[in-house]
Amino acid sequence: MRWYIYRYIYIYMYLYIYVHTYIYIYYCCYYYRDYYLGPPFFLPVFNLPSNPALFFGTALPTYFLFIFSCLFLFLPLLSFLILRFSSLLFCLSDIVSSTTLLRSLHSIADFLFCASFLFIALRSSFSSSLILIPSACNIAFCHFSFSFCLICSSSSFASILFFLASNNFKCDFTSFLAGPFVLPAFLNLCKSEVALAPSSNMIF
């Protein structure tokens, strides 16, 4: 049963990477013509811009997505461990790229913050849960108030996810597709925090 679940996640991740790679490439080539040259094979060739947020927010995630799409294209479905490691690696890498802000004062700080807990999340058994599906946490976290976020600060993992959600407000089509995966896991995660504070304001 778990094999079929991870195979479905594998197919979803490949489609997610494939689509978002071209979205990032189009965004970089169309809106930042001063920093990006003509892309051979639809791969953007960029110079380091004066604003570091452009590098961490657009160029670096573009190359990450392109490399991962090539890896997932030729990666065979051999075993359960390969699927689990590939899904976890993609989810953690997407956290780094999606939580980087397009502001020069905060982009590097957010990138270093994400890199600091990547190894902690990788060692945690809970990190392999479906709650780490890319862009899926946005559809659940955007319905909670800031007071409820402070209540969940006792849980380190929940506070990290709330921090990521507060820095990423985009709600695209893939978020709605991944919403059914993250919502049950998110409710189980915050069940204890809700029981401690039943009067917290939730905006559903």
Curated annotation (Swiss-Prot):
Miscellaneous section = Partially overlaps RRP14.
Q: What is this protein called?
A: Putative uncharacterized protein YKL083W
Which source organism does the UniProt entry give?
Saccharomyces cerevisiae (strain ATCC 204508 / S288c) (Baker's yeast)
Taxonomic placement: Eukaryota, Fungi, Dikarya, Ascomycota, Saccharomycotina
